[in-house]
Design a protein with these regions (language model features):
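Cross-kingdom TIR/SEFIR domain
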Residues: 50-116
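Defense-system signaling and execution modules centered on TIR/cGAS-STING-like, death/scaffold domains
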Residues: 7, 11, 110-122
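Short aromatic/hydrophobic-glycine micro-motifs
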Residues: 14-15, 93, 119
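Conserved N-terminal substructure of TIR/SEFIR domains
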Residues: 1-41
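Short, acidic/glycine-rich phosphate-metal binding loop used to engage nucleotide
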Residues: 23-24, 49-51
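Short, hydrophobic, well-ordered secondary-structure elements
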Residues: 41-42, 63
Length: 122
């Protein structure tokens, strides 16, 4: 899923994707880096699949700092996990069946957000 999102963001839209999941901690606090990266983001994309706790923290921080209107959430149901966690299930997210659905369902939503930002609506 990440490879498809990365291609869409970087190749199709010419933007920089910052993947918080692959940032190394080094000699600094990864949380501090995560918070700075989210605060500096114009758009926030999150994969809610697998209900990873760190992603839930990132989504919460992005809601406060980026705003729901500039966020794109997607979720792929897996065995035993049919919906995102209850506290995110009420938010707008795109349900995908596999990585191919990212191109079909997620890319147009990302374009809508970018268009809204470009004209100052978001």
């Amino acid at each position: 899923r990440l490879a498809v999102i990365k291609r869409i963001v970087e190749q199709d839209f010419g933007l920089q994707l910052i993947d918080l999941g692959t940032k190394g901690g080094g000699t600094y606090s990864i949380r501090d880096l995560m918070y700075r990266e989210i605060e500096a983001s114009d758009i926030f994309i999150a994969d809610l699949t697998s209900n990873r706790h760190n992603v839930m923290v990132e989504v919460g921080y992005a809601i406060k700092n980026v705003g729901l209107e500039r966020m794109l959430l997607y979720f792929e149901p897996m065995e035993g996990v049919e919906k995102p966690p209850f506290d995110l299930n009420g938010f707008r997210y795109e349900q995908i069946a596999d990585s191919n659905d990212i191109e079909i369902k997620v890319k147009p939503k990302l374009k809508d957000i970018l268009d809204g930002v470009a004209v100052g609506e978001l």
